[in-house]
């Protein structure tokens, strides 16, 4: 056979394939919504027509089984108030009812009272109220003992400084020093009674100590 036979056969094949695209029109990159492809025309139509129920959006297959529970009807959102626990805020049908508003206000008021702290200076100090015994921490007692070792009597200025340093009031500092002086005098009195001293304390020294006590009381 001659080579012209193969050339003619190949040429006829490509011309037959090109005839498929003779009627095709050049379009843009975006596809039209109603355009149909020629290669999928008869096959796709036959497949879609053979199963009409599968491709029908209004078919019962696509109906949600949860439509009754999640519908926007008023019955799905009407929640009844719970009666077994009155302390928990409940959902009511009508949020504008005064009973629901009063329940929310009372709950907020109870929470505010629970979070409210009462400090010692906020408590009443009437004559009928019993005053509790003041307890000092180990650090406060140590610092007060050190100060008492050097000065048994404090001026008002020094008392204010110690009160700020130890987070105490001036009255607490004053009472502690008064009690500590009474204890110190009692201890020294017992020591002096057990071991008699050769010389009695002079009246001048006693008067000086009395003057110091009077000055502290005035401060």
Swiss-Prot record:
<dbReference type="InterPro" id="IPR009057">
    <property type="entry name" value="Homeodomain-like_sf"/>
</dbReference>
<dbReference type="InterPro" id="IPR050296">
    <property type="entry name" value="Antp_homeobox"/>
</dbReference>
<dbReference type="GO" id="GO:0005634">
    <property type="term" value="C:nucleus"/>
</dbReference>
<keyword id="KW-0805">Transcription regulation</keyword>
<keyword id="KW-0371">Homeobox</keyword>
<dbReference type="GO" id="GO:0000978">
    <property type="term" value="F:RNA polymerase II cis-regulatory region sequence-specific DNA binding"/>
</dbReference>
<comment type="function">
    <text>Sequence-specific transcription factor which is part of a developmental regulatory system that provides cells with specific positional identities on the anterior-posterior axis.</text>
</comment>
<protein>
    <recommendedName>
        <fullName>Homeobox protein Hox-A7</fullName>
    </recommendedName>
</protein>
<keyword id="KW-0804">Transcription</keyword>
<comment type="similarity">
    <text>Belongs to the Antp homeobox family.</text>
</comment>
<keyword id="KW-0238">DNA-binding</keyword>
<feature type="DNA-binding region" description="Homeobox">
    <location>
        <begin position="129"/>
        <end position="188"/>
    </location>
</feature>
<feature type="region of interest" description="Disordered">
    <location>
        <begin position="186"/>
        <end position="219"/>
    </location>
</feature>
<dbReference type="InterPro" id="IPR017970">
    <property type="entry name" value="Homeobox_CS"/>
</dbReference>
<dbReference type="GO" id="GO:0009952">
    <property type="term" value="P:anterior/posterior pattern specification"/>
</dbReference>
<keyword id="KW-0539">Nucleus</keyword>
<dbReference type="InterPro" id="IPR001356">
    <property type="entry name" value="HD"/>
</dbReference>
<dbReference type="InterPro" id="IPR020479">
    <property type="entry name" value="HD_metazoa"/>
</dbReference>
<dbReference type="InterPro" id="IPR001827">
    <property type="entry name" value="Homeobox_Antennapedia_CS"/>
</dbReference>
<feature type="compositionally biased region" description="Polar residues">
    <location>
        <begin position="195"/>
        <end position="205"/>
    </location>
</feature>
<feature type="short sequence motif" description="Antp-type hexapeptide">
    <location>
        <begin position="118"/>
        <end position="123"/>
    </location>
</feature>
<keyword id="KW-0217">Developmental protein</keyword>
<dbReference type="Pfam" id="PF00046">
    <property type="entry name" value="Homeodomain"/>
</dbReference>
<dbReference type="InterPro" id="IPR017995">
    <property type="entry name" value="Homeobox_antennapedia"/>
</dbReference>
<dbReference type="GO" id="GO:0000981">
    <property type="term" value="F:DNA-binding transcription factor activity, RNA polymerase II-specific"/>
</dbReference>
<dbReference type="GO" id="GO:0006357">
    <property type="term" value="P:regulation of transcription by RNA polymerase II"/>
</dbReference>
